[in-house]
Amino acid sequence: MFKRKSTAELAAQMAKLNGNKGFSSEDKGEWKLKLDNAGNGQAVIRFLPSKNDEQAPFAILVNHGFKKNGKWYIETCSSTHGDYDSCPVCQYISKNDLYNTDNKEYSLVKRKTSYWANILVVKDPAAPENEGKVFKYRFGKKIWDKINAMIAVDVEMGETPVDVTCPWEGANFVLKVKQVSGFSNYDESKFLNQSAIPNIDDESFQKELFEQMVDLSEMTSKDKFKSFEELNTKFGQVMGTAVMGGAAATAAKKADKVADDLDAFNVDDFNTKTEDDFMSSSSGSSSSADDTDLDDLLNDL
């Protein structure tokens, strides 16, 4: 059941999450704000505490999601756990120093962070059937910063930290989305004054909410992440020979050249040659050397 927690404890958990710095597939248990035709929408939600007292009430997932060469790469990133070596995309970014050398490529493949929480939907004008129910909610850095701003305050200046997830002393969150220059803008979203969730002292009501919640720590469990080998294979399929190194890249380029030469072969010219002409030209050392080089490169892979 729910327990009162100190804001200092939550602040420590939030700091740990911020140090870990996603993408998740469509989830039926996920709540999404419905927007009107103009791209605007609003609702009132309440962030809930963790289902596990030892865990933070939020989860952070890092992912790479992009399309290249007509193929998609959408995978969670091991940097979710602070491990940058087990992600082929992170290695590609680092090896090629994309941040400094290729801003366009970097923007395409860079890490993307998503934040998750259990929420109680207080008011949802566009979908009133959701009101009073608990969902998982995915949100971005703008809202994450607003949550942190309620916790990481300047106590010396008389500010009081608020654990917005506390069922008794937390605060409802007014989620407002407006379209600005073609993008969803969350600037007008804000926390209201501290208040208890209505009827929260009723243990049966607490149990009802608690049973609808999910253990967010399962989302970031390491056994949910694919191996480097599996990710590297997928990354290579999407990126093509651009990410291949050494003999593999050379062999791929050689194979591409052979294919181009075959495509450019003049069939009409071939039909005009005699058998002697053809046999003579095909016995040349250059072609034979190219074939041998290609075979050697492929055998070395």
From Swiss-Prot:
The UniProt annotation puts the region (Disordered) at: 272-301
Q: Does the keyword Calcium apply?
A: no
Q: Where is the composition biased (Acidic residues)?
A: 290-301
One GO MF term, please?
metal ion binding
Q: Name one GO biological process term.
A: bidirectional double-stranded viral DNA replication
- Keyword Lipid metabolism present in the record's keywords: the answer is no
Q: Which InterPro entries does this chain map to?
A: NA-bd_OB-fold, Phage_T4_Gp32_ssDNA-bd, Phage_T4_Gp32_ssDNA-bd_sf, SSB_T4
- Tell me the keywords, alphabetical order: DNA damage, DNA repair, DNA replication, DNA-binding, Metal-binding, Repressor, Viral DNA replication, Zinc
Which positions are annotated as binding Zn(2+)? 64, 77, 87, 90
- Report the domain of life of the source organism: Viruses
Q: Where is this region: LAST?
A: 3-7
Read off the Gene3D superfamilies from this record: Replication Fork Single-Stranded Dna Binding Protein
Q: Where is the composition biased (Low complexity)?
A: 279-289
Family as reported in the entry's similarity comment? Belongs to the Tequatrovirus single-stranded DNA-binding protein family.
What does the record give as the function of this protein? Single-stranded DNA-binding protein that participates in viral DNA replication, recombination, and repair. Coats the lagging-strand ssDNA as the replication fork advances. Stimulates the activities of viral DNA polymerase and DnaB-like SF4 replicative helicase, probably via its interaction with the helicase assembly factor. Stimulates the unwinding activity of UvsW helicase, inhibits it DNA winding activity.
Q: What is known of its domains?
A: The acidic C-terminus is involved in modulating the ssDNA binding properties. The N-terminus LAST motif is involved in the cooperative binding of the protein to ssDNA.
- Its quaternary structure? Homodimer in the absence of DNA, monomer when binding DNA. Interacts with the DNA helicase assembly protein; a ternary complex between the helicase assembly protein, the single-stranded DNA-binding protein and ssDNA is an obligatory intermediate in the helicase loading mechanism. Part of the replicase complex that includes the DNA polymerase, the polymerase clamp, the clamp loader complex, the single-stranded DNA binding protein, the primase, the DnaB-like SF4 replicative helicase and the helicase assembly factor. Interacts (via C-terminus) with the viral SF1 dDA helicase.
- UniProt protein name: Single-stranded DNA-binding protein
Organism of this sequence: Enterobacteria phage T4 (Bacteriophage T4)
Gene name tied to this protein? 32
